Structures are given as structure tokens and as C-alpha cells.
Amino acid sequence: MAKWVYKFEEGNASMRNLLGGKGCNLAEMTILGMPIPQGFTVTTEACTEYYNSGKQITQEIQDQIFEAITWLEELNGKKFGDTEDPLLVSVRSGARASMPGMMDTILNLGLNDVAVEGFAKKTGNPRFAYDSYRRFIQMYSDVVMEVPKSHFEKIIDAMKEEKGVHFDTDLTADDLKELAEKFKAVYKEAMNGEEFPQEPKDQLMGAVKAVFRSWDNPRAIVYRRMNDIPGDWGTAVNVQTMVFGNKGETSGTGVAFTRNPSTGEKGIYGEYLINAQGEDVVAGVRTPQPITQLENDMPDCYKQFMDLAMKLEKHFRDMQDMEFTIEEGKLYFLQTRNGKRTAPAALQIACDLVDEGMITEEEAVVRIEAKSLDQLLHPTFNPAALKAGEVIGSALPASPGAAAGKVYFTADEAKAAHEKGERVILVRLETSPEDIEGMHAAEGILTVRGGMTSHAAVVARGMGTCCVSGCGEIKINEEAKTFELGGHTFAEGDYISLDGSTGKIYKGDIETQEASVSGSFERIMVWADKFRTLKVRTNADTPEDTLNAVKLGAEGIGLCRTEHMFFEADRIMKIRKMILSDSVEAREEALNELIPFQKGDFKAMYKALEGRPMTVRYLDPPLHEFVPHTEEEQAELAKNMGLTLAEVKAKVDELHEFNPMMGHRGCRLAVTYPEIAKMQTRAVMEAAIEVKEETGIDIVPEIMIPLVGEKKELKFVKDVVVEVAEQVKKEKGSDMQYHIGTMIEIPRAALTADAIAEEAEFFSFGTNDLTQMTFGFSRDDAGKFLDSYYKAKIYESDPFARLDQTGVGQLVEMAVKKGRQTRPGLKCGICGEHGGDPSSVEFCHKVGLNYVSCSPFRVPIARLAAAQAALNNK
């Protein structure tokens, strides 16, 4: 018989895949003798079995759960469902990868109308008993039956107003008893007359099902896609004996970190609430006290807490994020996990742990989440603009960085505005997991309620989004879509600015600037460079991009898109003249006017590179992208060229293609208009030779012919390039070497790579187009249906963001092998967007590519991911 349920004492840290992160850590804490409420874990395999059984919990799993409940009853001397002294439990999810806010918790399970009265008598504290019951009704209704939380919040707010009190804790036992009745009425109405469940066993199975179900709720799917978590992992369920932080003034609950999750600074960091349950701190309903205040409130508990927190950090050798409850002066740990942290904090903590002798340099490099380095490059405010800014309020600096944008009040509105290209600040009373897509779309998040460990703070830090939380002075009018702060009223669409590092809120749109990186970043990067074997280049089209990328550690340019150089105002007219010319001579004349511009750009880039390699891709987009499409611009072009408007319109219409991405572009342009390749070759070679003469820098130009699908195609263009390159060398008296290669971006090129390698001296995989051509859908149109594919679990991630290793990856691997059979030592790289995606970088390492190339600000990510790939695949 399969084992679906494990007591905490039966597990250990090595069982993460089976018990989930929370379950294996609770097991490990049990081994360490920590004060934790005992319980058991229903495994991730049980979750998979639930889905395989048509979303039903099999009888075998149910039997094992109730056997474990019997064991808990014996352990606690209480009965589940007893009317006088009931055993109460909490039910929490726990996937193997931490997913903050994605899964749902239920506390006080086991209470019903009769048990609550016995519970009140047994504890001698009716207020506590009815507070626990109304919380359970609210959580169960929300999590299990999906009755919106807002229904209950409105009732609580109305009662507090009626009683003239500010906080839930000011309500009396009778008030809370009345609340419980009102909550049950809400449940009954929402459930079409069905009463709130009174049988504890039914409550428990409903809760376990809800946790399994929540693995596949929309926000969990979005979070998994954003964080590359496979959908088939499933979640475990942890059932734990309840301990109560809401028993009075000697009880409380809190969340704490062993180091600051925003800065990485060593020292306890966190907050707690007296007379509260765990969800109160995380949900941010009341603004909590800093953890250091606990030393004054409960000195013995504080000392014990500090000792145990340090013990946990030493044991797990990482910064810990701990949840704890104090019940009438007795401390319990509810869970611990490696804490989520900002990228600057991750770097600082990793370096400090190396210095403290807890971990090695290799472990430090592997621990940093490569994607998180994006956060380091988030903007700060321009100091001059900031001086002129008007501070309208301040609150908690929950996630660092600076952001300015238009105010929106709901996640859907924020997402819609972002999709229109607007910069968005999401303003909410408090955020919840349902807001995840709006939070992802926002430049910054501002909340009225909640502390440094609220949902908004934790999720924003994880995403690297600026967040200011707990600004209680804000008055939001959700119906009017306005909020008041600092004597000002802001409507939807008005600009505000947030500083997530100081907690200040500013009126208006304050200019931001790029961030600078810290010493710990440099240390980690030095270690990463020591361990990686894969080179990292950048995709850059301007001298500015090149300098930025070199500063961030790029070892060359893997893709210089020459067409981007033509779109500037003084150049676009010349390329348009070339396109509209009807003879080779006229085209050559127009192109010759472009040579100084292209050459000037190449010279500046070669100088910025200081001898690092640069792969220059020849003109790739279809010509229709360069021609004017408005009548006004067409008339101006006609005037400049001495043509009629009708002639210009006819030429523009002639260039129109039904499927331009698979049309007259790439090397096909050079076959029909060899003069374009001639001009570009002259510009590259003259620039390289002149820079070498001026600076003494050794340069070997790498010329890349795009969109090749046939060896003869490449040979045709290569012959044109060689003829001009040799001519320029002769004119300049130079013996400069150069290489001619191709982009592998058509499946046929990968299939015939052995033949293509007879002509190509290097391969660069253009995985954007290779993905389009292999899947048969375009990057521009896929967004219309990919969401449906995620929901149907056909795809788990966007194939344009994360390389499809099964299909597209197979073509890449095949092309590398075939190419190197023909030309041993063939240099192979990747220059699509995938070059900065960590999982794709690891794939590139495994198949033996020489380098990856990505956008300048993703260079540090690729450097770190390449080191991790080398260390993880030793």
C-alpha cells in the first residue's frame, strides 16, 4: 500500500519533493527538537493522485489522513469534533518551491456551533472562542467555497463602525458571536441555502481538497509561469495542531527573518501582533510592531526566539523566514523556510555567509537566483528631479527601487493600462494573491494596510517591483476611483512617484535613472566568471548600448542589428531613396550616402569594445518596414525624389507582403539587391581597418548572413562579401582577417547544417525566428492564444521567453553536431532573447555552445546562469 501521509517525525530535509518545502522543514525542525505544534503532511504524490482521480481524494488517502488525526488526538489528549474540548487544526499548503501568497491557509478547523460553546467554557475565554470561530467561517468560506472575502470584511467594518471601535480586537465576545452568525448567513446565501458544514471530518476533507485545487488556481498558474515552476510538481498539505495567538495580551503571532530581506544586513528583522492569529500579520489588516519590541513585551519569549532563530540559520546555512505564535507566554514555531529576498540582499547575504565560513564560493554562486539580478538594474530617482519633488506622505519601504506612473486602483485596470504602454502605480487597500497580474504589470505598488511582511511586500520583493506599504493616512474612494493623501486628491490616471527604499510618496512624475551596483555584486560576478565556461556577449546596436554592456561584463557583441542604424531621421530618407530607386546605379548612389553613417557607428562600437569580438548581422527586416505608410510622409518622400505621390504609393503597395516574416527579408534581400551587402561590407571593413590603425586594437570582423536556409544562398552572398572585403583590404593596404558565418533560424538550416558549415565559419542561433518557424506561430500573434494554452496545460511557459528544449532545442543540438562534423571547432552561439533566460543558458552549456548573447541589462544574469550551469553539470 502506498504511503500518502507522513507524521512530521517521519520526515527530513531530503524529502522536499515528497513533503514539499514546508513539510520537510517541519520534519527537520522536529528532529532538531524545536517547539513546533505537531502534525502530519499529505504528500505531493497525493495531490497528483487527486488530479489523476478526477479531482477526488481516494478512500485510501482519506483513511490515512484520519489515522493521522487519531494519532494527533492521542498526542494532545483531545478529540477531533469533541463538543467540550475539541482538537483544532490548521491546514496549509506547501509546494516544494516556496510560492508566497499563492496557496491558502485555514485556521481553527474543527469548530462548529456546539464545539465553540464547549471551547469557550474549557478555555474560560468566550471572546477568544468566538473570535476563532468567526475567523474559521471566514477562511473556510473564502478558501474552500470561494465566497469572496470582501463580503465578510464589509460586515466586520460595519460592526466596528456601529460599535465605535477601530480594531477587531476591540469587539466583545457577544459582538464576535453575532459576527459568526452573520458570517454563516453570508455562507448560506452564497451556497444557495446550504448550511455551513458542522461535521469536522467533512471540513477537513474540504480543506485538503481546496489546497490541492489551489495548486491550479489562475494566480498559482501565473506565478509558476513567472518563476519556471513545473505544473506537475503538485503541492503537499500540512495539517498541524492549532496554537493560538489570539488568546489575549500574553499571546501573539509574528513573522521574522534572521537577516534583513531588503538589504541583507545581519540581524533579526520582522514584526508581530499581540492578540492576533497568523493571517493578521501577513494579510496586513492591522499594522504590526517591530520584532525588537517583543523584548519589552515578553523578554523571556524574545530571548528564546532569538536563540532558536540563530540555531535555525546555522542549521539551514541560509537566511530564515520564520512564522511563530506565542500562546499565553509559550513560544511555538509554525514554520521556517529560506527567506525570499531582494537581489541586493541575496548578494550581500551570500557574501556574508562565505565570509562567516558557512558556505563556499561555489554555493554562493549557485544560491543566487540568476533572474533576480534584473532587480539590481532597476531605476532610482534623478537627484535633481527628486529635490524638486513634493513629498505627500511616507510609509514602510517594503521593496526597493523607484517608480513613477499613473494611478490605477484594480489589478485588471493596471494590467490593461500596462498593455497600452502606460507606466502604472497600483494603489490598493491591501493586495491579495488575486492581484498578481496587476502587480506584475505595475512599476510600483502602494498599499494602505500591511507591514514589511504583508502579501504586497513579499510578492513585490520577489518580483523586484518597488513597493511602499502600510500608508494608513490614505483615504481611498473605490467608487469614485480617487484617493486622498497629504491634502491632495488623486484620480485614476494621475501621476505619483514612489521610493521603495525610503517609503516616501511624491506628487507627480519624477524622473528616474539607472541604478549602480554594489561591491557584493562585483564579488559574486568575479566568482561566477571563475566557474563558467560559456562566454557571454550582448545584443547591441549603438555605441551607448555597447558601453553599457561592457560595463556589465559583456565579452563582445553577439548580435549587432544593422537595420536599427537606419531608422534615425537623417538616415531613413536615404534608405527610402534606395528602396524606391529603379536601377542598380541609383540604389548604389543612395547606399553610398549611408556608408559614412554605418561606418561611423561601427567605428564607435569597435572602439567601445576594445578588441572584443562583434558579430554584425546584415540587413534582415523586409523593406516595407522602412517605407512611409502615412500619406503625409509619402508626399514628402515623393517631393524629395522628384516622383509623384501615386508612384510612391504604388511602390509601397508593391512591397506589401501577406506574411512578411517569411517573405522578402534576410539573405533574400542580399540575393535580389547585392548592392546592400556590398555597402554593408565596405562599412564594416573600413571601420575595422581604420580603428585598428587609429588605436592599435586587433579586430577580426564577424559578418553574419541572416535567414539562410540553403547552402547555395549563403555562398551567393558570401561571394559578394568576400569580393568587397578583399577590395577594401587592397585599397587600405591591410591584411585584416575576417569571418563570415550565418544565423541558424530556419529549421532547414539546422537540418542541413553539415552542408551549410562548408561555407559558414560560425553559427549563431537566432532562436526568436527559429522558435517562430518551428512552432509555426508568430511572436506578435501568439499572445492572443497562449493564455488558453497555459490554462489547458498544453504549454507551461512562453516558448519565446524560455527555449523549447524538446523541439527547438533538438534542432539546435543537431545543427551544432552536424556543423562540427564538417568544420571541427566551429564557433556556435545563440543571440535570441533566450540568451538571457537562465534555463535556456543551461541548455546552451549542455549542448556545447561557445557563447550566449543577450540584451545589455541581462548580461549579469547570463554570466551567473552560465556559472550555475557549469557547477550544476560537473
From Swiss-Prot:
Superkingdom field: Bacteria
Gene Ontology molecular function: ATP binding; kinase activity; metal ion binding; pyruvate, phosphate dikinase activity
Region feature (Central): 400-498
Cofactors that this protein relies on: Mg(2+)
E.C. numbers: 2.7.9.1
Family the entry assigns: Belongs to the PEP-utilizing enzyme family.
Segments for region (Linker 2): 499-533
Matches recorded under InterPro entries: ATP_grasp_subdomain_1, PEP-util_enz_mobile_dom, PEP_util_AS, PEP_util_C, PEP_util_CS, Phosphohistidine_dom_sf, PPDK_AMP/ATP-bd, Pyruvate_phosphate_dikinase
Other facts: The reaction takes place in three steps, each mediated by a carrier histidine residue located on the surface of the central domain. The two first partial reactions are catalyzed at an active site located on the N-terminal domain, and the third partial reaction is catalyzed at an active site located on the C-terminal domain. For catalytic turnover, the central domain swivels from the concave surface of the N-terminal domain to that of the C-terminal domain.
NCBIfam families the record matches: PRK05878.1, pyru_phos_dikin
Protein name (Swiss-Prot/TrEMBL): Pyruvate, phosphate dikinase
Alphabetical UniProt keywords: ATP-binding, Kinase, Magnesium, Metal-binding, Nucleotide-binding, Phosphoprotein, Transferase
Keyword Transferase: yes
Function: Catalyzes the reversible phosphorylation of pyruvate and phosphate. In E.histolytica and C.symbiosus, PPDK functions in the direction of ATP synthesis.
Post-translational modification: Phosphorylation of Thr-453 in the dark inactivates the enzyme. Dephosphorylation upon light stimulation reactivates the enzyme.
Gene source species: Clostridium symbiosum (Bacteroides symbiosus)
Phosphothreonine modifications at: 453
Binding positions (ATP): 92
N-terminal: annotated span: 2-340
Active site: 455, 831
Catalytic activity: pyruvate + phosphate + ATP = phosphoenolpyruvate + AMP + diphosphate + H(+)
SUPFAM superfamilies for this protein: Glutathione synthetase ATP-binding domain-like, Phosphoenolpyruvate/pyruvate domain, Phosphohistidine domain
Activity regulation behaviour: Activated by light-induced dephosphorylation. Inhibited by dark-induced phosphorylation. Both reactions are catalyzed by PDRP1.
Lineage: Bacteria, Bacillati, Bacillota, Clostridia, Lachnospirales
Recorded domain comment: The N-terminal domain contains the ATP/Pi binding site, the central domain the pyrophosphate/phosphate carrier histidine, and the C-terminal domain the pyruvate binding site.
Assembly with partners or alone: Homodimer.
C-terminal: annotated segments: 534-874
Binding site for substrate: 561, 617, 745, 766-769
